[in-house]
Regions:
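Conserved PLP-binding catalytic core of the aspartate aminotransferase-like
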Residues: 152-196, 205-206, 210-214
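Pyridoxal 5′-phosphate
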Residues: 1, 9, 13, 31-34, ...
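Active-site phosphate-binding strand-loop segment of PLP-dependent enzymes
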Residues: 5-61
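Active-site C-terminal subdomain of aminotransferase-like
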Residues: 21, 55-58, 65, 70-171
Length: 214
């Protein structure tokens, strides 16, 4: 039998708790992004972890947009919240965002990794990364962990941009500018492009209708 998938509203911990109460006695896996790619906000990892521990659910976090950008040294949402000693049960990261390469990794217990190696079709039926890709990822991680890490400069640039735009200081490099009207967002993106700025307009179905952003 396949798993039953239930979606809880974005950031609504009360709704998630109600779902976990209803599913009491069943095996549950809570899945969330670490950094939400459209608005740059962070998942409330400490609260999610506490809820999952209380109800015996496992927690999986996709930190694709966190690795290399979030946390003092770019180690992602776990570092941002200081939860290195209590990480999610499954942490997924990618090499195709901040690291500028390809591939990804699943960080979990030995038993979970063993199960994935045997049963996860995307792993079983995928070709391994090429040596060149592996070398690029290794080099990117070395830079991230080295004395000349670009992460502090990234954080300063994000703060500077947010301040100049009149926005609150932002925890991630994804800084959304609300426009609302889709045509206006597309026009603004076009005009920015003519001035040499690549600022995509995000509109439905990527974001809800009439809530377009840059």
């Amino acid at each position: 039998h396949g798993a039953e998938v239930t979606v809880f509203p974005h950031g609504d911990l009360a709704a998630l708790q109600a779902m976990l109460v209803e599913a009491s006695g069943q095996r549950c896996l809570v899945v969330t992004d670490g950094v939400f790619s459209m608005d740059g906000t962070l998942a409330p990892l400490p609260e999610l972890t506490e809820l999952c521990r209380r109800f015996g659910a496992a927690l999986m976090v996709d930190d694709a947009h966190g690795l290399g950008t979030v946390g003092a040294t770019g180690r992602g949402i776990v570092e941002h919240f200081g939860m290195q000693q209590d990480p999610p049960d499954v942490l997924v990261v990618t090499g195709s965002k901040a690291l500028g390469a390809e591939g990804g990794a699943v960080l979990a217990s030995e038993s979970v990794i063993a199960m994935l190696r045997q049963r996860a079709r995307p792993y079983v039926y995928s070709t391994a990364p090429s040596p060149a890709v592996c070398a690029a990822l290794t080099a990117a991680l070395d830079i991230l962990n080295g004395p000349n890490s670009p992460v502090p400069d990234l954080h300063r640039n994000v703060d500077r941009m947010a301040t100049r735009l009149g926005l609150d200081t932002w925890p991630t490099p994804i800084v959304p500018v609300a426009v609302g009207d889709e045509a206006s967002a597309v026009q603004a993106a076009h005009e920015l492009g003519e001035q040499g700025w690549f600022v995509p307009a995000m509109r439905w179905p990527t974001v809800p209708r009439s809530r377009a952003i840059l």
